[in-house]
A protein has these predicted regions:
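Hydrophobic alpha-helical segments
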Residues: 1-203
Length: 203
């Protein structure tokens, strides 16, 4: 069961509620924010930060979603794994492509750039001090310095906030397999993911 209570919309800070267009969303879409809403100023800062990150992104939406889902698997963040963003689906992140994340180094439908980015993400999750000159040199063959900074920052966001979300155990609205106990390893690849638009208003 969840470890922190989700606020109802009536309990939300009005500005946060408007920023998230919360009245137009389902309880499932609002679940992580309904916990963050206990601290409205931090929640609003998080919304603005992630919105700015997407607005100024130089990496493709497809790559960011692949990295997010691969990290969600390492984190075992059930709410992260069960969700797909609509803009990523529109950018070509199909469930067949998500299945490639099981063994990304072998997947024929991933590009060389995506494979090295996912290897970097894997190490960020599991052994960040093993990331050395050789991997950064390989990243440089596919990405600009600006893109590498964005990739690392995206990994940091997904790892940190994903692990936090995993400890909150917000699984009550998720498909059944994502509600399995912590001793069961769950994967993001499968037929039961759901799509969220997640629009925000930052002005």
């Amino acid at each position: 069961m969840p470890r922190l209570r989700s606020l109802t919309l009536d309990e939300f800070d009005p500005e946060l509620r408007a920023m998230l267009n919360a009245d137009q969303k389902s309880e499932r879409e609002m679940r992580p924010t309904s916990v963050r809403a206990h601290h409205p100023e931090l929640a609003k800062a998080y919304v603005r930060f992630t919105a700015a990150f997407k607005q100024h992104a130089v990496l493709s939406t497809r790559l960011r979603e692949l990295v997010r889902l691969r990290i969600a698997f390492h984190n075992q963040c059930r709410s992260c794994m069960a969700m797909r963003y609509a803009d990523a689906v529109d950018a070509g992140v199909t469930e067949d492509l998500v299945c490639s994340l099981e063994k990304p180094h072998e997947a024929p439908d991933l590009t060389d750039a995506e494979r090295v980015a996912l290897r970097y993400a894997d190490l960020m999750c599991t052994n960040h001090l093993a990331i050395g000159d050789a991997l950064y040199a390989e990243l440089a063959t596919h990405f600009s310095d600006k893109e590498v900074v964005e990739l690392g920052s995206w990994c940091a966001i997904c790892i940190g906030f994903g692990r936090l979300a995993a400890t909150w155990n917000m699984v009550e609205d998720l498909p059944e397999r994502f509600q399995a106990g912590a001793d069961t390893t769950v994967t993001p690849w499968g037929p039961d993911a759901w799509v969220t638009q997640a629009p925000v208003k930052t002005h």
